[in-house]
Amino acid sequence: MTDWRIADVWEAIARKTPNRPALIQGQRVITWGQFDARADALAAHLVAGGVSAEAKVAAYLFNCPEYLEVYFAAFKAGIAPINTNYRYGGEELVYLFDNADAEVVVFHAGFADTLEAIRSRLSKVKLWIAVTEPGHPAPAWAVDYETAVADAPPARPVKAPWGRSGDNLLLLYTGGTTGMPKGVMWRQDDLFNVLGAGGQAARGVEPIESPQGAADRLDPEGPRPPLTMVCCPLMHGTGQFSAFITLNQGGAVATLPSRGFNAVELWNEVERLKADGVVIVGLAFSTPMLEVLEVDPGRWDLSSVLSISSSGSMWSQENKRGLLAHCVNATIFDSFGSSEAVGLGASASTPGAEAATAAFVLGPTCAVFTEDGRRVAPGSGERGLVAVSGFLPIGYYKDPEKSAKTFLTLEGQRWSVPGDWAEVNADGTLKLLGRGSQCINTGGEKVFPEEVEEALKTHPHVRDAVVVGVPDARFGERICAVVEPDGAVELELADLSAHVRNRLAAYKAPRELVVVDSIGRAPNGKVDYKASRARALKSLGLEG
């Protein structure tokens, strides 16, 4: 099939197994039949609300069942869903919604005050829909989400006047390495294919050949399809795409009841639900998960866990070994990719055979190229940029210049080259070296240093500032501010962090401070980031 429409697949599954769970959060369970009906009602509400065929629907939500209902509704209506980082501040949200041409924003009502302050600047938004919660009713200018999904329309499934197509988009906004968020444009057909076309090779599940094929392989009274505990945010590609892979098989996606990650709660839920899959992002999750298991080994029955999957952040061989000691039936899958390049590489770890940190097997459609377009030969020691071909995004939304820099024609075919440097070992495996830019990856969140530097430099007593990443046992890296003061007062980390949090998302605020006499910029105004980081490491006692 060459025109996959994700809603068609999910609707076929809902018809076959309407009483099976699709979405779980704590004691709340949305069956496949309810998932389909609620998404139909929301899709009808969007179409009746006057959205255009090019509409974008922003999900400004914490993890919750409504998140995936919004995506299902957008797929049904043939319009594009977009993710929204719920940690963003007002200015970041204005940029994102304006850049995306968002016509609908579905938000947790707890964000109402933030949106109220910027709503007048978002003239493109036609519909505001609030997911209410205790203490946070829908504001007067928004529709209550439950009102929007209360009644499924008589004509189902819902389709907009412009219909559905495999060309319908999903926009995945990523902070990336070059400043403000960029919207990666995935055609539904390409996305469905790159995510396994309804299959999952790691579990031996074959791709399907038609939407009905997804339903035909399900038995309402037979073995349970996958139940995946997605611990990381659905607003990021790792969580979102992992959820899609599970739903494409007719499985259930479970999210944690709490807003923040709690390892004890995770293992409680895994045991209660007998989850067979767990999705995380590297050290920020695996470290606390392992710590609570080590404190009380044997507390939980984790025999149901068959896979622990991670992508978006490197994590250690030691953590993999530790988790496998407690999840004895599991395989750990560590994937290397990005929003614009799915499937660059992967590693699989089993008890006694744990993959090393940053070691990956190249994907079947991947290669490593030098900057002048030559393939890197295995064992040559030459460094190059990892690239993937096959099913790729169209490019970045409204940014042809950046699209041209990332999506290249090499050896006569189109490749996505997101900027990750690597060497190819003699056995063909990949040794990942990292992103060539100065982007800082802290717990899976990408932070662009210049953005934080500019915020720091608005402080009345900061003359100049540079931001670097320093090692962090849990988050991979943490933000360090190297600051040149004006000399009037003694700068304090708490004050500078609060200053940044007032302007940017909290995860971008510095957690370390190094005060210097001079930043030491070159005559052209540029700074030596390598030297700045070395200076920070020395000052913090982290060198060597």
Which residues make up each language-model segment?
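Conserved AMP-binding/adenylation subdomain of ANL enzymes
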Residues: 192-230, 235-276
